[in-house]
């Protein structure tokens, strides 16, 4: 009853994936629940053993570099699937003029995760589809998945991720109050000799101009200053280095200035101690959606911000390129100045960025997670 009410109140289609084991402890079934915006529940059941056999060749064809990951088949909770997905993200990072023709994984993943439920998804691309994955599936870059015609999923639908049904809540997200924005870019000096990010500084200044505020840049961008401002902000945008720890997710961190002998790292564990009221936290940094994989998602920066009180986060799944990321982010905030929702604004920004930077490595890294 709750999931039906949430779907109706949010006017969204909810897609929940659940992996079922047999008596031998093997992943044997993939259960998929789809709840449309009218509250109607549909259920699809997929045979994972059959899927393993069907996609083994396709997985191997992704690239020679993913052969080792593919050798384990599609065991959806085997740690090797994380390597498999990482290899796909690696392929996205590698520029290729023949991307749509050569890269097999996004089409295989589309066939596995989207095709069985495609008839249940909304026809209007502006209508929201919220994916609620399990385990390593949380790292699948859904916007970059492709159908047989080479069309990306983000071209077909407005997308968002959520760790759980409960995270979505019953209410529509409130409009972001950009008058209480914290914008940070290119802290200096960086800890551990991390490189300065001139593109992140330009990005922060451009976004601050759109929002009518001033960005915190360079030596002013200390961890102490950021924490103090975060707890008052309704919108937080952090353009800096992100470091993830896939073994101890709570040690994933964001880099800030080391001025005044500060260590310069704000960890996911430290974020849990904050009391936030932000409608949106944007982590414009590398790998901010990564962390330790568990059965119910990723333990890392995104989850910590949500648990600390943020309504939504925007995070990345791989090393993001400077210029394309700056273009995507500034476009996203420009789109938000209208009456678009956060997922709609991100979709528009991705489609616009795609025109200048056609490779998915440039535009598909970021996902919205949360309410």
Predicted regions and their residues:
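A short acidic (Asp/Glu
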Residues: 118, 137-146
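Functional beta-strand-loop-alpha-helix junction segments that form "active/interaction loops"
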Residues: 1-2, 99-104, 191, 196-250, ...
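Catalytic cores of nucleophile-dependent amide-cleaving enzymes
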Residues: 161-174, 234-331
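Residue-level detector of buried hydrophobic side-chain packing
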Residues: 15, 32, 129-131, 184, ...
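Two-metal-ion RNase H-like nuclease active-site motif
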Residues: 10-24, 236
């Amino acid at each position: 009853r709750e999931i039906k009410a949430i779907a109706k109140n949010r006017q969204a289609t909810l897609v929940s994936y659940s992996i079922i084991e047999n008596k031998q402890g093997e992943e044997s079934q993939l259960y998929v629940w789809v709840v449309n915006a009218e509250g109607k529940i549909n259920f699809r059941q997929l045979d994972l053993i059959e899927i393993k056999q069907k996609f083994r060749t396709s997985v191997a064809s992704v690239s020679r570099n993913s052969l080792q990951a593919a050798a384990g088949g599609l065991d959806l909770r085997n740690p090797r699937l994380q390597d498999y997905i990482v290899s796909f993200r690696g392929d996205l990072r590698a520029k290729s003029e023949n991307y749509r023709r050569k890269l097999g994984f996004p089409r295989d993943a589309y066939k596995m995760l989207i095709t069985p439920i495609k008839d249940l998804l909304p026809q209007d691309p502006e209508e929201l589809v919220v994916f609620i994955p399990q385990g390593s599936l949380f790292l699948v870059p859904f916007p970059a998945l492709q159908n047989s015609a080479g069309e990306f999923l983000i071209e077909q639908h407005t997308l968002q991720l959520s760790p759980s049904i409960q995270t979505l809540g019953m209410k529509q997200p409130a409009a972001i109050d950009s008058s209480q924005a914290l914008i940070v870019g290119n802290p200096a000096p960086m800890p551990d000799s991390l490189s300065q990010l001139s593109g992140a500084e330009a990005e922060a200044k451009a976004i601050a101009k759109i929002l009518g505020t001033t960005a915190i840049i360079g030596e002013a961008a200390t961890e102490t200053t950021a924490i103090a401002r975060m707890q008052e902000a309704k919108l937080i945008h952090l353009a800096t280095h992100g470091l993830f720890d896939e073994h101890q997710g709570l040690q994933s961190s964001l880099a800030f200035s080391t001025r005044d002998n500060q260590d310069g790292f704000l960890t996911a564990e430290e974020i849990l101690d904050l009391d936030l009221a932000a409608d949106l936290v944007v982590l414009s940094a590398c790998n901010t959606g990564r962390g330790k994989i568990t059965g119910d998602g990723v333990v890392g920066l995104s989850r910590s911000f949500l648990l600390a009180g943020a309504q939504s986060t925007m995070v990345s799944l791989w090393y993001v390129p400077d210029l394309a990321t700056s273009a995507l982010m500034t476009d996203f905030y420009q789109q938000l100045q209208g009456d678009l929702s956060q997922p709609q604004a991100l979709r528009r920004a991705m489609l616009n960025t795609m025109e200048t930077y056609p490779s998915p490595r440039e535009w598909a890294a970021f996902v919205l997670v949360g309410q």
